[in-house]
Regions:
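Conserved tyrosine-mediated DNA breakage-rejoining catalytic core shared by Y-recombinases
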Residues: 1, 10-13, 37, 46-84
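Basic, Lys/Arg- and aromatic-enriched nucleic-acid-binding interface segment
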Residues: 1-41
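Catalytic-site neighborhood detector that most strongly recognizes the C-terminal catalytic loop/helix
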Residues: 5, 66-70, 82, 103, ...
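Short basic/aromatic active-site micro-motif
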Residues: 26-28, 100-104, 120-140
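C-terminal catalytic core of tyrosine-transesterase DNA break-rejoin enzymes
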Residues: 32, 36, 42-43, 112, ...
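Short, polar N-cap/turn motifs at the start of nucleic acid-interacting alpha helices
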Residues: 51-58, 120-121, 141-160, 171, ...
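Active-site/catalytic core of tyrosine-dependent DNA strand-transfer enzymes
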Residues: 78-120
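C-terminal secondary-structure termini that scaffold catalytic or DNA-interacting sites
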Residues: 176-193
């Protein structure tokens, strides 16, 4: 399957663009949280305070069985993910952490978020999970660790992320070479003036 994900630049735009509307802001925060944890929408809906723990070094993490695979995901928390958590319910285990409606109800807000940041194609919630996998692969995190964080039942699923980033890296390198070529020819003409 072709995993669709957002670029780092698109992620930075989403991070730096707080929304004027409460529902849109909730959608934005949930999307960012998923980009930083790899949790699917349904898993974020099911996230309760007891899924959040702290290790001996004081590092917070999420430990949750994924609804789709029933496989445990173990995710050390990024500081921005911790910041988002602090805005929601991390105390009352009777309630989920995030007050999320069903996924289809937030479809419009996620789409709108894509429009606001100027994304060329439709932004979908699932791209956030794929982006998490892609960001980790790009950061040279071992595939076994990524599989554990994403709650994949098979390492082969995780390897799909490695394939797309290889393709993307090749394309990006081609673009870079093309730009360099243009710059070097452009510089020569400037120097002769």
């Amino acid at each position: 399957t072709k995993h669709r994900y957002i670029s780092r630049d698109e992620f930075k735009k989403i991070l730096s663009t707080p929304m004027y509307d409460n529902r849109l802001e909730l959608a934005r925060r949930a999307f960012i949280f998923s980009c930083l944890t790899g949790l699917a929408y349904v898993d974020i809906q099911l996230l309760h305070p007891h899924h959040i723990g702290m290790n001996a070094e004081g590092r917070r993490y999420i430990r949750i069985n994924r609804k789709k695979t029933k496989v445990e995901a173990f995710i050390p928390l990024h500081p921005i993910a911790e910041q988002i958590l602090s805005l929601y319910n991390t105390a009352d285990d009777e309630q989920p952490v995030f007050p999320l409606p069903n996924r289809d109800a937030l479809w419009f807000e996620i789409h709108e978020l894509g429009v606001i940041i100027g994304k060329d194609d439709n932004l979908s919630y699932h791209q956030s999970r794929h982006s998490f996998g892609t960001f980790l692969i790009s950061a040279d995190i071992p595939i076994e660790s990524i599989a554990k964080m994403m709650g994949h039942s098979s390492i082969r699923t995780t390897q799909g992320y490695a394939r797309i980033t290889d393709d993307k890296i090749s394309k990006d390198m081609d673009k870079l070479m093309e730009r360099r070529k243009k710059q070097s020819t452009g510089e020569k003409t400037n120097k002769s003036n």
